[in-house]
Design a protein with these regions (language model features):
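Alpha/beta-hydrolase active-site loop signature
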Residues: 30, 54-58, 120
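Flexible "cap/lid" loop of the alpha/beta hydrolase fold
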Residues: 100-105, 109-150
Length: 166
């Protein structure tokens, strides 16, 4: 019986390749699966590469909460929804922490774990990111906007400052 995760949301994804082992690539904070397209193209002959957008990122649905536990459950539900039993898992930055959570909680689903640009510790710069997120929330913009819509809504000078800080 497949477990049900009430907080999990369906993830938008891109897929490259039709043969070889399944490799799931999890992007970092403020990114999307699109960030890994050139990497996917470079190994497409050897793997089936799945690149989901995390909740509140890319084209995946937005949710009120975003914990590593929830993001790990999103990944496992993604695996279930796509008939993927045991996979290779690569995570970058935030995706690396999510990948570690998947491997820790669901070891039977992960044959290989690759973590890029992250360690299993709390980083002080997280507070800086949290301040940026709170500042963006205080701008009063609608919750569901694409990056293009945000760029049109804010003065160009402010946009340069925001993306420079990220």
């Amino acid at each position: 019986m497949t477990p049900t995760y009430l907080e999990a949301i369906p993830l938008n994804y891109r897929k490259y390749g039709d043969t070889g082992p399944d490799l799931i690539v999890l992007h970092g904070l403020f990114g999307s699966g699109k960030n890994w397209r050139s990497f996917a193209r470079s190994i497409v002959n050897d793997f089936q590469i799945w690149m989901p957008d995390a909740r509140n990122h890319g084209e995946s649905p937005h949710a009120e909460t975003m914990s590593y536990k929830e993001m790990a459950e999103d990944v496992v539900c993604f695996l279930d929804n796509n008939g993927l039993e045991r996979i290779m898992l690569l995570g970058h930055s935030m995706g690396g922490k999510t990948a570690m959570q998947v491997a820790l909680r669901f070891p039977e689903r992960v044959s290989c774990l690759i973590v890029v640009d992250i360690a299993p510790v709390q980083y002080e710069h997280f507070q800086k990111n949290l301040k940026l997120i709170r500042a963006m929330q205080e701008l009063g913009l609608p919750k569901k906007m694409t990056r293009a819509e945000v760029e049109k809504s804010l003065p160009r000078r402010l946009m340069k400052s925001i993306f420079f800080l990220l």
